[in-house]
Amino acid sequence: MNIINFVIDDKPISAPEGTNIFQAALDNNVYIPGLCYHPKLSQFGGCRLCFVEVTERKRTGHRFACAHPVSEGMIVKVNTPKVSRYRKSVMEYLLAHHELSCPTCDKSGECGLQNITYEMNLAPGRFKTVRSHHPVIRDNPVLELNRNRCILCGRCVSACKEIEGIGAIDFQSRGFKTVIGTAFDRPLECSFCGGCVAVCPTGAWQDRTLGFKGRAWEFNSTPTICPYCS
């Protein structure tokens, strides 16, 4: 396998050929904001937050880090003024449509959207607040789906299809009416592995058995073997 040498923010980076910029940055402790990328899932490019400046073959342009492969000698800049303005606009748009229920959300404290909002020091944005008011779906004893918190990152859809091989959920409708759900809004029929909860960055998917049992920082992590993955 060929090794590609390039630069991110003046830091020399090496990565296997075919690696995308986002993963190469992760592997080398370089932070690029992102909410839809997951190393175990196919690239989706839905959140638009991993926007970076790329110079390769003497041409400079802008790319999404999760969808652009590394190339020999490329120069990547993560935080130029234009890049920062673009990311801020994307975040302002997401927050204008997102249910701000952080005090009662079990994801609070480990929420990707919350963390990036804090990092960017965002105040109320320029966009008019237009939030959805979907009913919370609790059609089974294990999982619940709050579409008002969903940013349509696609992680849960990919995890259900690619890891579990079930495909119980998918995108519904188009445009501003797009939501995550089951076919014909039928009750969820799956193995209830919790993969959707594990990969969700915003708390749209929740484990009903853990609701209000503690804050994210109060739980201890324990190495274990997942019966669905072993």
Feature locations, PLM:
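N-terminal cofactor/phosphate-binding cores enriched in small/glycine residues
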Residues: I4-E72, P81-Y86
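Fe-S ferredoxin-like electron-transfer domains
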Residues: R48, V52, E56-P227
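Short, surface-exposed beta-strand/loop patches at domain edges
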Residues: S230
